[in-house]
């Protein structure tokens, strides 16, 4: 299972725009070492691993507390909490899948999708659950939401750093491949014929 090709292209273009370091003139390492460099982030992968086991505990805790306080909530907050639980569950499954695929297989579009889902959707939702006192927040809820928020903040930072490394390596490889191609097939007469080529035909004509 992979992302649709149009979405992959859009995420790839977004990554090149946001994460490319324009100040970087070339690779920091020799080409052989750069080719063998592992770009996957171990801290990010460990965070995703523990997140996979933590999320069911968070879900069960949140559903249990929602059931207990449901009668005292207003209809407005009842609707919001049920909607948030459904959306958070769906987003988290997709988010963790993209994180695993993007980090382990060094796929930029998948990791960019993971980063965007974490930053723009999941983190704001968890902060809403953590700080909105109208939800009648219980101690267990606050505890699991704080842990979840810490996971998300760390993953946003770690994924950002990893994406910058991946995109810059891809950009470096692209420029090196272009340079090698020009060396193998040099573009001659780029600015017109050289002086020697202009002089030789004139000399070969001789006097009339």
Swiss-Prot record:
Subcellular locations according to the entry: Cell projection, Cilium membrane
Membrane topology listed for this record: Multi-pass membrane protein
GO CC term (a single one): ciliary transition zone
UniProt keyword annotations, A-Z: Cell membrane, Cell projection, Cilium, Cilium biogenesis/degradation, Membrane, Transmembrane, Transmembrane helix
GO biological-process terms attached to the record: cilium assembly; non-motile cilium assembly; smoothened signaling pathway
Family as reported in the entry's similarity comment: Belongs to the TMEM17 family.
Alphabetized PANTHER family for the sequence: GEO07735P1-RELATED-RELATED (PTHR13531), TRANSMEMBRANE PROTEIN 17 (PTHR13531:SF14)
Quaternary organization: Part of the tectonic-like complex (also named B9 complex).
Name of this protein: Transmembrane protein 17
This protein's encoding gene: TMEM17
């Amino acid at each position: 299972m992979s992302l649709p090709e149009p979405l992959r292209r859009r995420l790839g273009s977004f990554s090149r725009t946001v994460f490319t370091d324009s100040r970087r003139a070339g690779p920091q390492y020799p080409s052989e070492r750069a080719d063998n460099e592992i770009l996957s982030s171990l801290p990010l992968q460990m965070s995703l691993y523990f997140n996979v086991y933590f999320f069911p505990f968070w879900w069960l805790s949140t559903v249990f507390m929602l059931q207990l306080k449901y009668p005292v909530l207003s209809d407005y907050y009842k609707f919001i909490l049920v909607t948030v639980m459904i959306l958070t569950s769906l987003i988290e499954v997709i988010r963790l899948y993209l994180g695993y695929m993007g980090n382990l297989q060094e796929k930029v579009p998948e990791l960019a999708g993971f980063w965007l889902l974490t930053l723009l959707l999941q983190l704001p939702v968890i902060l809403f659950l953590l700080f909105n006192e109208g939800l009648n927040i219980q101690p267990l809820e606050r505890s699991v939401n704080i842990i979840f928020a810490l996971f998300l903040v760390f993953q946003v930072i770690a994924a950002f750093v990893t994406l910058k490394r991946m995109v810059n390596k891809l950009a470096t490889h692209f420029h090196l491949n272009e340079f090698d191609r020009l060396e193998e097939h040099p573009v001659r007469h780029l600015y017109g014929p050289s002086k020697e080529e202009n002089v030789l035909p004139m000399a070969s004509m001789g006097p009339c």
